[in-house]
A protein has these predicted regions:
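N-terminal transmembrane alpha-helices
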Residues: 3-37, 50-65, 69, 94-101, ...
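Helix-terminus/linker motif at the lipid-water interface of multi-pass membrane proteins
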Residues: 24-43, 112-119, 175-182, 243-270, ...
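Short alpha-helical transmembrane segments in multi-pass integral membrane proteins
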Residues: 1-15, 70-135, 179-233, 290-357, ...
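Small-residue hotspots at the loop-to-helix junctions and early N-terminal turns
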Residues: 39-50, 125, 129, 188, ...
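Short runs within selected transmembrane alpha-helices of multi-pass transporters and secretion channels
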Residues: 63, 131-150, 158-169, 187-202, ...
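Transmembrane helical elements of multi-pass membrane transporters/channels
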Residues: 10-29, 131, 142, 165, ...
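Small-residue-rich hydrophobic transmembrane alpha-helices
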Residues: 42-102, 139-158, 264-328, 361-380
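Hydrophobic transmembrane alpha-helices of multi-pass small-molecule transporters
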Residues: 54-57, 169-173, 198-203, 273-277, ...
Length: 436
């Protein structure tokens, strides 16, 4: 592999930009819905995001799991796995996306009710969920192709695809929500069309014949599918848990502060989604590098990549917290169409507490990706399940009972801090194995 420092910056810079772009799908909807529909639209969007997170999580699990195995096989020159893995992953993606598509056509309303939509928000939530579920095959195939193209030596093309999808979403959001007056439906259509354009950009990889992965005739292999799921499980848990946490927070906040509290949380959660994407960008950027180094047994380079990744994570955490702390008022005001003082107060206070979580999030996300990339899916799964479910759910109920809405804002910072302890242990344990 070429100079490891140059490779790190090549992959990580492209992926941070790309992931920020990808995360702006929902942030753009948040902004335009806030301005064009109002607080009920924000609430409806926030209620819809958990099902989006689950769908997106499955796509990332298959994409990251399949691409990680593909990259490791490239590193150790296992040509049989290289030939088969993409086809297995694509078939699995189409299976799951078909289920979501059918649910979008037949069950959007009951799903909305299950997610907490009430009389004021049911129609808006149903409109949004129905449209993006129908477009699930494009969302999931886009995730799959982004991961494989990145691991096939084209991180810049993956970045361009993600940014194209994001910018087109912003433009179409504006056109469909305002000039066309489609409101919630327009925002959903803009988001749904974005992965289609992203896939068109990714097709350049095949048109130029730069691809080393192909479709081939194979028998479905349960063993290979389970291997993909194991290596990608941490990505699934991160996405699914964020959806479950959002659903749980929505319900708790509804009881504490009503719809206006959920709207305020929607602002916080969607800004947090963009900030989290920076750490996801670092982790997904180092994944192909670490996987190939692991396949070649280049353990010294893996240590160097980890040092760079953690340094970048800490620097970004400090900078992002300072920016959101100092400018919290104008940031919240941008999403508050009616200048509601209650929404302003709840969201600004929440940002100051909630965003301390980023001091620890990067370490935990990068560690989970490092463990998956070095063929330690069990440890990555343990770390992710503690972040996503084991600690955060009881912590949310306990802290909200003790401190009200401030307890909600404290839940993730405390959870991520606790998870950092086993994360450091797993890193040290794995690196010691490399020294043997």
């Amino acid at each position: 592999m070429q100079n490891i420092t140059k490779t790190f910056f090549k992959y990580v810079s492209a992926n941070i930009l790309g992931m920020i772009g990808l995360s702006c799908y929902i942030l753009a909807d948040t902004f335009f819905i806030a301005r064009g529909v109002g607080a009920n639209g924000l609430t409806a969007l926030n209620l819809a995001i958990p099902i989006y997170s689950f769908m997106n999580g499955l796509g990332l699990m298959i994409g990251m799991g399949g691409a990680t195995r593909y990259s490791i096989s490239r590193g150790n020159a296992d040509s049989d796995v290289q030939k088969q893995i993409f086809t297995q992953a694509l078939c699995f993606t189409l299976f799951w996306s078909s289920i979501f598509l059918i649910l979008g056509i037949t069950a959007a309303r009951p799903i909305s009710i299950f997610l907490g939509a009430n009389a004021e928000t049911l129609q808006l939530t149903t409109e949004y969920i129905r449209i993006f579920l129908i477009f699930t095959p494009f969302f999931m195939c886009n995730n799959l192709l982004i991961c494989f193209v990145r691991n096939d030596g084209s991180p810049q093309l993956s970045m361009m695809a993600m940014l194209t999808g994001s910018f087109s979403n912003i433009i179409m959001d504006y056109i469909l929500v305002f000039p066309f007056g489609l409101g919630m439906k327009g925002a959903a259509l803009a988001t749904a069309a974005s992965p289609v354009l992203s896939i068109l950009v990714l097709s350049i990889h095949f048109i130029k014949k730069n691809n080393q992965f192909y479709l081939c005739r194979i028998r479905p292999s349960l063993k290979r599918i389970l291997d993909i799921c194991a290596l990608g499980s941490s990505s699934l848990i991160v996405e699914v848990s964020s959806g479950i946490v959002m659903l749980m927070f929505n319900l708790l906040i509804l009881n504490i502060s009503g719809n206006i509290g959920v709207a305020a949380y929607g602002v916080i959660a969607n800004i947090a989604l963009v900030l989290t994407s920076m750490y996801t960008g670092i982790s997904q950027g180092v994944q192909p590098v670490i996987s190939q180094c692991f396949g070649r047994r280049e353990h010294k380079q893996i240590r160097q990549v980890l040092r760079y990744a953690f340094t970048a994570s800490v620097v970004l955490a400090v900078l992002s917290y300072l920016v959101t702390f100092i400018w919290s008022q104008p940031i919240v005001a941008a999403f508050n169409k009616d200048s509601d003082p209650i929404l302003n107060a709840i969201a600004e206070n929440g940002m100051h507490i909630y965003f301390t979580t980023f001091l620890f999030v990067g370490i935990n996300i990068i560690t989970a990706t490092f463990l998956s990339s070095t063929d330690h899916p069990k440890e990555a799964f343990i770390l992710s399940i503690f972040r996503g479910f084991v600690l955060v759910i009881p912590m949310a109920f306990l802290l909200s009972f003790l401190f009200g809405i401030n307890g909600i804002w404290l839940t993730l910072p405390i959870t991520e801090f606790i998870v950092t302890i086993p994360a450091i242990y797993f890193i040290r344990k794995t690196l010691r194995k490399f020294s043997l």
